[in-house]
Design a protein with these regions (language model features):
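Class I S-adenosyl-L-methionine-dependent methyltransferase module
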Residues: 2-22, 94-296
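Conserved acidic E/D residue at the C-terminus of a beta-strand in Rossmann-like folds
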Residues: 88-93
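Conserved class I S-adenosyl-L-methionine
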Residues: 61-70, 86-87
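Core SAM-dependent methyltransferase catalytic element
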Residues: 386-410
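A short acidic, Gly/Pro-enriched loop at the edge of an enzyme's catalytic core
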Residues: 60-63, 310-326
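Conserved beta-strand signature within the Rossmann-like core of class I S-adenosyl-L-methionine
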Residues: 328, 354-367
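A short glycine-rich, Lys/Arg-flanked "PGG" loop and its adjoining helix->strand segment in the class I
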Residues: 341-354
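Conserved alpha-helix/loop element of class I SAM-dependent methyltransferases that forms part
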Residues: 41-64, 341
Length: 410
């Protein structure tokens, strides 16, 4: 008998096939493997900086936001701006179940229990709170997702074992830490550097040699190696500018940017990558949705957030015209064909209110839309070059080639 969780998985498979394969006549083995991997939990934490997003979007109490959810961290952080409505969407049923669990926890738990659940994310008390408080509040597909798992390991137990070590990205980070130790490098030592100068010096002295090694160059020259970063074959080529032999150098530059773009006591992305945890002693070095000062506001605004398992194009297609103020695409367009990007922007334009803004990241530097949109569409959207480049320089996640802010000029 098929469970509701199985239905969510089947929907993930169908949505991901459409996203990865698009209109390709021939599906490669790389595409098939990536689509299979991406049906699982990929991002226990989202890897776009919400602080940058909020500065770009300038949300207010009348804003309707449409965003790709991923792990839900940023959709929750946007609530701090008290917009009228946030419509979150994701292809992956695991991400949808994670967002629904977070929503329920914000509604039902006090701050201490909420932070233990999603900040520390490594306590048996989390399982108790799930069973006694949250379980009865969740819908059936979400219950079934967290109660099931491989070989009898219930997924909810990830929050006892250390949630941020799971997911494709969490496992990859763990593998990188293991590999670094083989070179005699403890990546956690970045966390004790006192300023950005020391962080850069430490990286150059201890970490650069790993990226420069022949074995790393060999491994990173294969697209399969980056699937655990959630990077599909098309985005892999954009990341290395079509030259796989240069991928190790590209990854070194991005890793150094992550390690040095901000002081380590102000960059929770670097803490997760190099320390595999959050900085529990420093509230200011946490995602906004995990900070105590924002918790009551989150509780008050949580009903403004909805989450749906769907394609963002279909969500926009079903929205009324002139109804959306902000669209956050993450790096989704790196996956898309030219026709798919054009279709997406037709719907974005149809639903856009006056002054609407769209933000997204790209693996490479160039924007994918400038050469794709028809003159009619292109004339309605203007890239804010100065602000885009400025905000990219501040983005603490440090892994993307560019940040793009487009503003509606109707």
């Amino acid at each position: 008998m098929q469970t509701l969780s199985d239905v969510g998985l089947e929907k993930s498979k169908e949505l991901l096939k459409n996203a990865v394969y698009g209109k390709k006549d021939k599906k490669t083995i790389k595409d098939k493997i990536f689509a299979l991997l991406f049906q699982k939990l990929v991002y226990p934490q989202i890897w776009e900086d919400p602080q940058v997003d909020l500065e770009a979007l300038e949300l207010n109490e009348k804003s309707h936001v449409v965003t790709i959810a991923s792990g839900g961290c940023n959709a929750l952080s946007y609530l701090i701006a008290s917009p009228e409505k946030i419509t979150a969407v994701d292809l992956n049923h695991a991400h949808v179940a994670l967002v629904k669990l977070k929503i329920s926890a914000i509604k039902e738990l006090d701050y201490g229990d909420f932070y233990r659940f999603f900040g520390e994310a490594k306590s048996g008390k989390n399982i108790d709170n799930y069973k006694k408080i949250l379980y009865s509040k969740l819908d059936e597909p979400t219950k079934e997702y967290w109660d099931s798992g491989i070989l009898g390991f219930q997924r909810i137990r990830m929050f006892k074992k250390g949630f941020y070590s799971f997911g494709l990205l969490g496992k990859l980070i763990g593998f990188l830490h293991f590999g670094a130790r083989l070179y005699g490098v403890s990546l956690e030592k970045l966390l004790i550097q006192k300023n950005k100068i020391e962080q850069a010096r430490w990286f150059d002295l201890h970490v650069s040699k790993i990226f420069d090694s022949n074995i790393f160059k060999k491994i990173s020259s294969s697209p399969f190696a980056l699937f655990y970063l959630g990077i599909p074959p098309k985005q892999y080529l954009a990341l290395c500018d079509g030259r796989p032999e240069n991928m190790a150098q590209v990854l070194k530059e991005r890793a150094k940017h992550l390690a040095t773009v901000e002081r380590i006591d102000r960059n929770y992305f670097a803490w997760q990558a190099f320390g595999r945890k959050y900085d529990h002693s420093n509230q200011e070095n946490l995602p906004q949705y995990l900070q105590f000062c924002n918790f009551n506001l989150l509780k008050n605004n949580i009903n403004k957030l909805s989450i749906d398992q769907n394609n963002i194009v279909d969500v926009l297609r079903n929205a009324p015209g002139n109804s959306v103020d902000s669209v956050i695409l993450l790096d989704a367009q790196d996956w898309m064909s030219d026709d798919e990007i054009s279709t997406l922007w037709i719907e974005i334009t149809r639903t856009a209110r006056q002054g609407a803004k769209v933000i997204f990241r790209t693996a490479g530097v160039a924007s994918p839309i400038d050469s794709i949109l028809t003159n009619v569409l292109a004339n309605k959207w203007q890239r804010n070059n100065m602000k885009s480049d400025y905000l990219w320089s501040k983005d603490r996640s440090g892994i993307y080639g560019a940040f793009h802010l487009y503003e509606y000029q109707n």
